[in-house]
Amino acid sequence: MNAPLQSASTQLAALDGVLRSIGEVAVAVSGGIDSLTLAAAARRALAGRVSMFHAVSPAVPPEATERTRQVAAREGWRLTVLDAGEFGDRDYMRNPLDRCFYCKTNLYGAIRPHTTAQVVSGTNLDDLGEYRPGLVAAKAHGVRHPFVEARIDKQGVRAIARDIGLGELAELPASPCLSSRIETGIAIDPVMLECVHEIERLVEHDLKPKTVRCRVRAGGVVIELDEACLAALPDERRGALTERVQALFERQNFTYGVSFERYRVGSAFLHFKRPVSDR
């Protein structure tokens, strides 16, 4: 789903119009480029009528929280950091296909007691063409999506980020929550997520890939790399990395075989896709 090609200033004007029509917003900030850009744009459009909320949990990469805190301090945001409590939700922890529904249900439920403002998310136009059970939770909680309302896609978000001075953050790669690395049906385990995060940082340091994901599947651990990095990986380094990955998991009493594959978006989801009911 593509938005018409427009200049960054035109898209920013459309976004400003949506935000001003809302009046007062509470931005759910994950630490990714979409929500950071929305928060920065809202601060400029609405001044003091904006608050930001960031949730921390074992599924949130520490660097996402640190990035959010740094931008908030620099931009003068009113930021609340909270625990959304999804790790106390059995439905979330059993990791069903619609796990994101339970994650967002907990997130929006945790934000609501702190504000009477309209809660908004960084969902953009491209997201509507993907499997996003979190959008069902957003609808149930009355959350609005200003980028969607302004017909702005991912490319437009990055253009706006550059236009409003977010600098190198405009090129920030996508980095979904750590629970997205665990195959559907394998229970979420905080210690396992720590291992996943540590391994991804290890591979980033050693190989400098454009993209890396450490997936935990029923058949073992899969290190997914962008095609160029995978093609250039010699057998010797692959073997050494395999041993280090296995050792990290074994240190936490997990035993897995390790393989390397080309990066595929959302490959930890099982292949079937069933509709998420409008609970």
Mark where each language-model region is:
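ATP-dependent adenylation/nucleotidyltransferase module used to activate substrates
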Residues: 2-163, 221, 239-253, 262-278
